[in-house]
Amino acid sequence: LTLVVSPLIALMKDQVDSLVAKGIPAARLDSTLSAEETSKLYQKLEKNSIRLLYVAPERLANEKFRARLAKIPLALLAIDEAHCISEWGHNFRPDYLKLTHFADELKIPRVLCLTATATPRVADDICKHFKIQSQDHHQLTFYRANLDLVVTPIATHDRRDYLLKQLKKSPSQPTIIYTTLQHGAESLASFLKSKGLPVRPYHAGLRSEARSEIQDAFMSGEVPIICATIAFGMGIDKSDIRAIYHYNLPKSLENYTQEIGRAGRDGQQAHCELLACQDDLRTLANFTYGDTPQPDALRSILHILLDQPGEFDISTYELSRAHDIRPLVITTLLTYLELEGFLRATSPFYSTYKISFTRDLEHLLNGFDSTRQSFLRKLFETAKPGYKWLELNPENAAAKIGESKEKIVKTIGYLEDLEDIAVKPSRLRQGYRLLKKPDDLPALTQRVIDLFQRRENSDLQRLQGVVTHALKPSCLYASLLDHFGEEMESCGHCSRCHGHAPPPNLPSSASPDLTDEDFSLIQNLVNLKQPGLRTPRALARFLCGMTSPATTYSWYLPDGARRKQRLISHDAYSLLELHPFESILKICEAQIIH
């Protein structure tokens, strides 16, 4: 069996469907499969009738899954998007860090790491983690002669009309326009559509059905132009994309390379243009600053995690909301504690099941003996009734009826397999085992704080690398290849090679001055004492328009009716988004301390 680790369910599905169509016995194991489908898949694995199994990296954190794999001969571990393992990579994913440990535990004899965007530093990191010798590291060239790279320095207020003019030259050719923000994709698509262009927006904020419909329309040629965030493109295999426009600066040269790489896969010439404006740097830097957790929040989480009994479970979602830290940061912290030998992940489980009977309960019970009927009656009596669904908590039910939680979960799965009930599991929790306590908790805390500070600095350096590239006076392709450890004299067909020299600096707009009204607004927000805005960083994020777990909190409208709305509906949300995050953070610190 070859085990393939891939980061996206959509990508796995496309690849497995393609392999099966070619007669190759491949399968995927992911959260979209039903209990019955999962059971059938395991049966096929046990019979060795599957050659390739695709899983997400998180799947290997499941102790039960690893126990099943240990019984199956594994020939190869293939890791797609392997740059995700590197702290220095542009798309670090903490679960990738544990893959080396799992490869050793499962005694997999060979590992294949694949990536299209590894810098020399990231490649060294991958080789170090998987003990890959230098002679086994193979790198193909990043140069593609059919991609014409263009950088156009342009002011924010000129960008939209310039893009319209460019698109009108060939309005029917397949084109992707990348924007940073979801509302940017929406507003730009709306503008271009009003000018008669066949365009649709695409971003993660759309419903999955809408995203699928838009993607299908683009693939078929019905809609040739897509305005999208980076949510669009992974797994898109359309060979005739003729143009890629970066309406905003990309967040790294790795992202830029990945995105322009979607053009011209048929070998024909394609146009890749970056509309470079310094103003974008402020927005991207704000996101980076906003992602960095508060030291006090990290101290609190470490204290909670390392003061647990031997076996415990947590909800990443609950920890995230309680400490106003993004779930990815929580996952990174948990992974770090695992790699340091403090914790060991066991198995995830759902703490709540919504249950709907597909037939009358009495009719269902008639199919069982009296002992099981009694057990099922008691079990369903513990559930909280709703309009269409019962809500059952296995842990609470176990305590009430004196049965094990494992038996209750197994029973729910069994009834679902029989199609006696429909089930919606929710509130995922991850089990952990505490292996040891730190000898010096303050020192460990400081190491964790430093870890996230390094991450912030690394992300900011990548942003600056994009600006440096945009201002290069020499060949753009040579500049890009140098970033990935390749050498090239000049390509002869980029905008620099065609004689278009860059300005000394990218066009930029000055941040507006803060007014007395702005300072008064900040103080009023402090005086509200909202739970989601109690720290300077949370308040600064809110004012700069960044979403975080805290912005999902509710606040009471000041009308005396005790009506609640989410914080992001507040008039002050994103009011200071044109200001640098660091400046707003300093003001918030001064106001809260005062």
Please place each PLM-identified region on the residue numbering.
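Accessory DNA-binding and partner-docking regions appended to nucleic-acid-acting proteins
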Residues: 295-594
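Helicase motor core with emphasis on the C-terminal RecA-like subdomain
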Residues: 1-3, 10-364, 370-371
